Amino acid sequence: MSRWRSFGLLGGFVVAMLGFGAWYSYEQLHAEPEIPVKATLTVYTDLPNNVTSFLADEYLNEAQVRINVMPLTGEQMAKRLDSNYLDQRGDIVLTSKDNLMLGAKSDHLLGMYSERMDLIAPTFKDSEGRWVGLWYDPVVFTQNTSYYNRLGQFITTWGTLAKEGPWTVVMTDFMTSESAANILHSFVEIHGEAATVAYMKSLGTHVTQYAKYLDTPIRLASLNEANIGIGNYSDGSFYVRQGYPVKVIFPLDGTPYYLTGAGILKSSNQYAESVQFINWLLSAKTAQEMQKAGYSYFFTNPEVKDPVDSLGHPLVLLETQGGYTVEGKKSLLEIWLKQVRFGQ
């Protein structure tokens, strides 16, 4: 009896192995072929993980080059690009204009040139080719459709927004977001510290909430919980695509913007491959793929058409130079915190 049991177990094992073998062969036959990798580039960045993952996957599929993403915070990136930071291993940095200007000043970045980079407006690149802007996210006003149809459509400038009136405003707390704080930095560069503080105090009389997250003002405006939400174009476009009753308005008197760009580290021994990747980031095709994936920015490539706002107006940017230091930013935030945020 035990002999037949042994034969049965052996037979079952053989059948199981044959079944596994057939399944494994089927999986191997239908599995996607592994992409051959020609090179690997190490990229330091403080961009959101979803953006860098998307770009890395797209470039691997298209160019067979793996992007090794090294995520940092904005503050860590600033320290890395400071002149006192000597360990500059890696190939590329993807970060804000301020950090790129710091890296150029600290002599950490190589000059780079290409026909595609030559097309980019001087406003969006370094005069010596040490960095180039890829895309930018401007600050916009957002309003619920019902409020927009009544009074909101006439609030089209920063000047009007801070005047006396019955409207309510939600904006992101400058202390919680580098992107939001760029409003403060830009206004001080254009108008000076005293005039900016006075303006922010006037605007503060309308502010019902300083939000923690960037998209909160837009969400509250779209839900008609606030008349006007001050936020980024990328977030406003997201809510429009999701079908929320929200209108996006570009301030006619100019608006701050957050420029993201790229530079090649002097430590890189893959200069040609790095330039090719940055050229790819600048391409109209990459911009179109990003837009299809839901990443709504203004692209520095002049071949990519710029959108207009809900009134049909084109974007007007404040003519700022940027390059604000970490110490300068902290000082301005302290002034805003004491005199505006808690000094009403």
List the predicted regions and their residue ranges.
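Early extracytoplasmic/lumenal segment of secretory-pathway proteins
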Residues: 6-8, 23-103
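A local structural motif
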Residues: 37-41, 62-71, 89, 193-211, ...
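Extracytoplasmic ligand-binding site segments that recognize negatively charged/polar headgroups
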Residues: 46-47, 52, 89-225
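A ligand-binding cleft/hinge motif common to bilobed small-molecule-binding domains
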Residues: 98-102, 222-245
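Periplasmic-binding protein-like
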Residues: 119-123, 137, 169-175, 199-204, 210, 281-304, ...
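A bilobed periplasmic-binding-protein/Venus flytrap-type ligand-binding module shared by bacterial periplasmic
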Residues: 142-147, 258-273, 289-290
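Extracellular/periplasmic bilobal clamshell ligand-binding domains
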Residues: 307-344
